[in-house]
């Protein structure tokens, strides 16, 4: 199904918990800054995802908080697995990944994205307020070992991390991971000074790239191949291209459909209709009708 701007719905991002085992100072909490409501059950998540297939969803991304804190995560994955779904991936900080990688693979997870903003142990501990970078590295190694690939490393480009980019690139090249460089969205005014423009970084990468590809169904993102390393950029801020080609809807941890990453004022309750035994199609239709580009071309 297309929205009124002609954008197909192909991807569904599920936040399954607001809780996290780290306290990264920059976290935007998937656009939900306050904890409220109760978590959806594995069964409810499964029913909501199965309903989304009618509207064209073919890719699922599981996120949090930290999704590995849900002890029923393998059950959630099993419940959403369907032959119509081409890809189920998960975004994690990697702290618990070594322990659970095999169980997730066995449940039907295809691949993982792991957040890693620095390779400096002390800086990592400072950014995450106590995180152990060695646990993350071991988790990445285990994920690759069990076949949760292609593994992506999510690098958040900020004023305090950008000097780590060359080392992160070398690390990803060495382990065979894809590097995703993400623009920082400051959700609070006091964090604005950490934002940097990633356009010049992308321009430099483009100059050195051996090949450049365009991902049509991922906001027309460019993918750069440079010395054997795949690099992608995610630039949601003031980016008309990002919004114009968006194919994703979202589900909050407490069961609301979220038409736009950057808005929190047009959510559509879907979990209570599920709990009441209602047909959820009209709620998906309402969500899709609410979609409009946050950043529009002038």
From Swiss-Prot:
GO MF annotation terms: 4 iron, 4 sulfur cluster binding; cyclic pyranopterin monophosphate synthase activity; GTP 3',8'-cyclase activity; GTP binding; metal ion binding; S-adenosyl-L-methionine binding
Pfam families: Fer4_12, Mob_synth_C, Radical_SAM
Domain Radical SAM core span(s) in chain numbering: 4-227
Family annotation (Gene3D superfamilies): Aldolase class I
Coiled coil: none
Textual note on the cofactor: Binds 2 [4Fe-4S] clusters. Binds 1 [4Fe-4S] cluster coordinated with 3 cysteines and an exchangeable S-adenosyl-L-methionine and 1 [4Fe-4S] cluster coordinated with 3 cysteines and the GTP-derived substrate.
Cysteine disulfide links: none
Biological process, per Gene Ontology: Mo-molybdopterin cofactor biosynthetic process
Described purpose of this protein according to its UniProt entry: Catalyzes the cyclization of GTP to (8S)-3',8-cyclo-7,8-dihydroguanosine 5'-triphosphate.
Cofactor(s) recorded in Swiss-Prot or TrEMBL: [4Fe-4S] cluster
InterPro entries per UniProt: Aldolase_TIM, Elp3/MiaA/NifB-like_rSAM, MoaA_arc, MoaA_twitch, MoCo_biosynth_MoaA/MoaC, rSAM
EC nos: 4.1.99.22
Family of the protein in this entry: Belongs to the radical SAM superfamily. MoaA family.
Pathway: Cofactor biosynthesis; molybdopterin biosynthesis
Residues annotated for GTP binding in this entry: 13, 61, 91, 152, 248-250
Binding residues annotated for [4Fe-4S] cluster 1, in chain numbering: 20, 24, 27
Binding residues for [4Fe-4S] cluster 2: 243, 246, 260
Name of the protein described by the UniProt record: Probable GTP 3',8-cyclase
Keyword list, A-Z: 4Fe-4S, GTP-binding, Iron, Iron-sulfur, Lyase, Metal-binding, Molybdenum cofactor biosynthesis, Nucleotide-binding, S-adenosyl-L-methionine
């Amino acid at each position: 199904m297309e929205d009124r701007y002609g954008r197909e719905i192909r991807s569904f991002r599920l936040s399954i918990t607001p809780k996290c085992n780290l306290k990264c100072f920059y976290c935007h909490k998937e656009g939900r800054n306050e904890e409220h409501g109760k978590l959806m059950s594995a069964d409810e998540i499964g029913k909501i995802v199965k309903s989304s297939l009618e509207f064209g969803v073919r890719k699922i991304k599981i996120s949090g908080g930290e999704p590995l804190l849900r002890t029923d995560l393998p059950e959630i994955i099993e419940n959403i697995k369907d032959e119509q779904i081409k890809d189920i991936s998960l975004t994690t900080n990697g702290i618990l990944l070594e322990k659970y990688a095999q169980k997730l693979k066995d449940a039907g997870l295809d691949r993982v994205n792991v957040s890693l903003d620095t390779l400096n142990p002390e800086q990592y501990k400072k950014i995450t307020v106590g995180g152990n970078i060695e646990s993350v590295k071991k988790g990445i190694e285990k994920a690759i070992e069990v076949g949760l690939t292609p593994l992506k490393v999510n690098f958040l480009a900020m004023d305090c991390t950008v000097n780590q980019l060359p080392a992160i690139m070398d690390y990803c090249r060495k382990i065979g991971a894809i590097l995703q460089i993400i623009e920082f969205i400051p959700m609070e005014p006091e964090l604005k000074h950490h934002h940097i423009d990633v356009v010049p970084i992308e321009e430099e990468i483009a100059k050195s790239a051996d090949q450049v590809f365009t991902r049509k169904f991922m906001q027309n993102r460019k993918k750069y191949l440079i010395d054997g390393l795949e690099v992608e950029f995610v630039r949601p801020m003031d980016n008309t291209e990002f919004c114009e080609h968006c194919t994703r809807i979202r589900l909050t941890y407490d069961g609301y459909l979220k038409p736009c990453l950057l808005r929190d004022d047009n959510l559509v309750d879907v979990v209570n209709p599920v709990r009441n035994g209602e047909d959820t199609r009209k709620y998906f239709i309402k969500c899709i009708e609410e979609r409009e580009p946050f950043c529009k071309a002038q």
